[in-house]
Each structure stands twice: as structure tokens, then as C-alpha cells.
Regions:
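Membrane-interface micro-motifs in multi-pass membrane enzymes
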Residues: 35-43, 96-100, 158-173, 209
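Aromatic-anchored transmembrane helix interface
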Residues: 68-76, 90-115, 126-129, 136, ...
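Alpha-helical transmembrane segments of multi-pass inner-membrane proteins
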Residues: 123-151, 161-235
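Juxtamembrane membrane-water interface segments that cap and precede transmembrane helices
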Residues: 26-27, 86, 149-159
């Protein structure tokens, strides 16, 4: 009896770690370039895991498909597939549809909720939050390496627009950086300070006024929502 319970708990823990690792890796690597092969591997593993879970306990996950979000994404996917009938290059169109809708939007709508179905709400929030923070950290690290390589070739920062491509991902990940400030712990405040300095340098290096304005507006809205006046004074 005891041994059966032990192995049952071990199996549940293994499954929980597997689920969390898949979601963490998917979010963390999403904004990185040059690792497409590994991204596809993660997507394949998530898809297989989702199919296995749905086949084993279909009723357990049925409520996830009774939402307006899933219905909207399903309609979008069907409409995109029907558009192939009018496309002059069905192969190229299918490739873009698979990448933009099926692999990203549909996967996020189905796979992530299914994989994290048995997790507590607090645990899901932590997984998603630290995944975005890790994604921001890796994005900043990879971009600093790019700046270092440019410097070795005699290209100084803010010299041209070659780093503008990171604007969208930096703006998208900015709220995660702001929420790091809400964790009242010395090590997290230090992490916030270090990441903030790097973030400011990189976002200025994009030379994108649209990105600057977006970060400013997001920051002001966040400060007003959470009433973090000290952060406003520091800024």
C-alpha cells in the first residue's frame, strides 16, 4: 500500500515537472532567434503531450474547449485554411499559416491550458511570470553578445538601425520586468535594477521612437494601476 502510494506520488511529480518544463521552455525560447530546430522540437513535444492527455481523459479537459477564445481561434484557423483555395502559392501560404496560426496561436490556446490543467492558479502564475522573466533575460543576453560582436568589428552602439528588430519583443516583455518590482525581496530588487539598466540600454539602441513611446505609456499605466510612486520617482 505504502509503496503503491509512493510510486503514484512520484509519477505525479514527474508529470508535473514535465508539464512545467515544456511550458517554461516554450515561452522562454519563443523570442530567441537562431534556434528554430529546438523550438520545433519543443512544439512537437507539447503537441504529443497534449494529444496523450486528451486521449486519456477527454472529459477532464472538455471545459477548456467551451470558451469564446477557443471558438474564435478555431474560426480563425478554419478561415485561414479555406483561404488556401484562393492562394496562387498554396505551399508558401500553408507554411505561413502553420507558423503564425497553428503553431503559435492554436498551440497556445489548446496545448498550454491542457498541459497546465491540473496546476494550481498560483503555480500557473509563477510559471508564466518566471518564464517571461527568463525570456527577457535571454533576449537581453543574446543582444548584448550581438553588441559585443559589432564592437569587435568597429561598430559602436546607436550607430545604425541594425538592432531595431528586437523592439517588438522588448516592448512585449516589458510588463514582466515591471512586475518583478512587486516582489519585495532584496535579490529580486537587485535583479530588477540590473535588468532595468540593460533593458534601457537595449531599447534605446533600437533607435525606434515607437518602441520608446510604447514603453513609456506601458510604464505610466502600470504605475497608475499598481500605485508604485517610488518607482516613478526612481524613473
Amino acid at each position: 500500500m505504502t509503496s503503491t502510494l509512493f510510486f503514484s506520488l512520484e509519477k505525479k511529480n514527474w508529470i508535473a515537472y514535465w508539464n512545467r518544463a515544456l511550458v517554461f521552455l516554450f515561452i522562454t525560447t519563443y523570442f530567441l532567434g537562431g534556434i528554430t530546430r529546438y523550438k520545433h522540437l519543443i512544439v512537437i513535444l507539447m503537441t504529443i503531450t497534449t494529444i496523450v492527455y486528451l486521449c486519456k481523459r477527454p472529459k477532464h479537459y472538455l471545459s477548456l474547449f467551451k470558451t469564446c477564445l477557443f471558438g474564435s481561434v478555431a474560426i480563425l484557423t478554419i478561415a485561414a485554411l479555406l483561404s488556401l483555395l484562393q492562394s496562387p502559392d498554396a505551399g508558401a501560404s500553408m507554411k505561413e499559416i502553420f507558423k503564425a496560426i497553428i503553431e503559435n496561436t492554436l498551440l497556445c490556446t489548446i496545448a498550454i491550458p491542457v498541459i497546465l490543467r491540473d496546476e494550481k492558479r498560483e503555480d500557473v502564475e509563477k510559471i508564466v511570470f518566471f518564464s517571461f522573466i527568463s525570456a527577457l533575460g535571454l533576449r537581453c543576453f543574446s543582444e548584448l553578445i550581438a553588441y559585443y560582436k559589432d564592437y569587435q568589428q568597429g561598430v559602436m552602439p546607436f550607430a545604425d538601425y541594425r538592432h531595431r528588430s528586437i523592439s517588438d519583443s522588448m516592448v512585449f516583455l516589458f510588463p514582466a520586468l515591471l512586475n518583478l518590482w512587486l516582489i519585495k525581496s532584496a535579490k529580486y530588487r537587485i535583479s530588477f535594477a540590473v535588468l532595468s539598466v540593460i533593458f534601457i540600454f537595449l531599447i534605446l539602441g533600437t533607435l525606434s521612437r515607437g518602441a520608446w513611446l510604447s514603453v513609456l505609456v506601458i510604464g505610466l499605466i502600470w504605475i497608475l494601476m499598481f500605485k508604485q510612486w517610488k518607482l516613478l520617482l526612481v524613473g
